[in-house]
């Protein structure tokens, strides 16, 4: 229920995600979480990188929460005066995941729209987001802090914790974490290490 508790979803919200429903990012952020609280969602069948179509959808259906990937934010930002040509005033929250969000794109979006983008990390194995920036506490270029119910750590290739400032592999644990991959014993052994998921 990270979407409900962390992002403050209510029955008055309307979500719009360009991520397709066969991705956990799309089905969680644009179907399961909004429906859980009685909110509505905008289902989008168009190509996600067609910025004008995405903006027209926002203008027409007036979502309050926009969920997409950095590539789409970049495509929108490449349209001159998009914020004057399209009404995106219904948005109260924007989220990003799927790839790193460059700090330059975050700053350009904030300058043009007045809205922060909350960069997040999640995966299919945890069902959705396990780390995110908080509203009003965003550090552009960072994916934030663990969401309640999840723990993370950085480890080396042998699974030993690395000191602060050292690059490592991200591990996560939480109640929604999968237990194994069906019929993939070797991949399961590599990825699921006790209660920790080796991302």
What spans do the regions from the language model cover?
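Phosphate-coordination loops involved in phosphoryl transfer and adenosine-cofactor binding
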Residues: 11-12, 91, 114, 194
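Short coil-to-beta-strand transition motifs
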Residues: 145-149, 197
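Gly/Ser/Thr-rich phosphate-binding loop
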Residues: 39, 63-68, 77-139, 151
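Conserved AMP-binding/adenylation subdomain of ANL enzymes
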Residues: 1-17, 22-64, 79
